[in-house]
């Protein structure tokens, strides 16, 4: 029988671009396609029978931007501009994040890119049972690694989606474990129209409410490159990380040892030992409620997505001031 090919359309070679200094980021926004069944980058240009590029974006716009709480000024120093298949994003050097979309002639968003302004370095995680892993020293979107600094918490993500959601930087720990109506982005409830990958691409700054998975009546376990939860994950065109990085599988978090309630309470997170002596800060940044405009357990609990799908959702690494586990 004839095998049907899966065609995945995308733009550029990564969804996140990080820089620590002022200047102009030049981002490839060539319209590509991939025939890979696992959504990996193949970078095949979309051309017509004459070899001319088709589906090119014609404009760019800033969907949101956020300067970190200890800085002043704008993350972007000027309006991003599209020149052919290059998106030019002027960055001021002020720490923070922005989401820039490229659009077609009708004004529809066809792709988007997370601009992340911060320094960063790599750490080596050594696990005697699971292997050695190279990991960035901070969460995606974080502009600090200092314990108890909200700038260290990073952005929020819905599993399988390529774009971040900004975090309010004025929430302080209180007796309440949930905070209502502080979310900074639009939202919509999943449906046959809304709960699709194509909707998330056109509306990257809209979070989708659901009772379980934002996908409507179906699930796609391979969006972050680990469809069966068993094999080593790969970087997909929906991966939210910078080039050279991808969402980790759960092996990367195995082997951590709970330290103490006092340490977690004092640091709003844990300093987990990653190689026998060196530590990495894991903040208790909380999470966005999947079905409401509600921020839950910020500075009480920490959650880290993995690329591994589960039976009803996806696995995440969970920790608080009492224990740590996978759920």
Residue ranges of model-derived segments:
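C-terminal, surface-exposed recognition/capping segments
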Residues: 142, 202, 207, 211-327
């Amino acid at each position: 029988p004839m095998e049907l090919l899966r065609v995945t359309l995308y733009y550029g070679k990564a969804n996140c671009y990080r820089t620590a200094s002022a200047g102009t980021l030049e981002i490839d926004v060539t319209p590509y396609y991939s025939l890979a069944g696992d959504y990996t980058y193949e970078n095949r240009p979309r051309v017509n029978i004459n070899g001319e590029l088709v589906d090119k974006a014609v404009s760019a716009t800033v969907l949101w931007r956020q300067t970190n709480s200890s800085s002043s000024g704008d993350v972007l120093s000027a309006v991003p501009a599209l020149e052919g298949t290059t998106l030019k994003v002027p960055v001021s050097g002020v720490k923070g994040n922005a989401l820039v979309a490229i659009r077609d002639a009708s004004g529809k968003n066809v792709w988007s890119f997370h601009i992340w302004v911060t320094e960063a370095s790599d750490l080596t995680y050594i696990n005697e049972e699971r292997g050695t892993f190279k990991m960035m020293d901070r969460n995606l979107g974080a502009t600090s690694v200092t314990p108890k600094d909200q700038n260290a918490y990073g952005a929020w993500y819905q599993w399988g989606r390529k774009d971040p959601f900004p975090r309010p930087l004025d929430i302080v720990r209180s007796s309440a474990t949930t905070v209502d109506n502080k979310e900074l982005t639009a939202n919509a409830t999943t449906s046959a129209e809304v709960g699709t990958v194509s909707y998330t691409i056109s509306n990257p700054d809209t979070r989708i409410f659901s009772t379980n998975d934002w996908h409507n009546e179906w699930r796609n376990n391979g969006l972050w490159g680990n469809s069966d939860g068993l094999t080593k994950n790969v970087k997909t065109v929906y991966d939210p990380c910078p080039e050279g990085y991808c969402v980790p599988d759960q092996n990367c978090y195995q082997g951590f040892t709970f330290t103490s309630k006092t340490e977690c309470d004092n640091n709003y997170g844990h300093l987990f030992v990653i190689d026998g002596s060196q530590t990495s800060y894991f903040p208790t940044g909380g999470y966005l409620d999947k079905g409401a405009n509600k921020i839950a357990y910020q500075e009480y609990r920490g959650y880290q997505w993995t690329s591994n799908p589960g039976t009803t959702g996806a696995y995440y690494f969970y920790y608080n001031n009492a224990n740590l586990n996978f759920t």
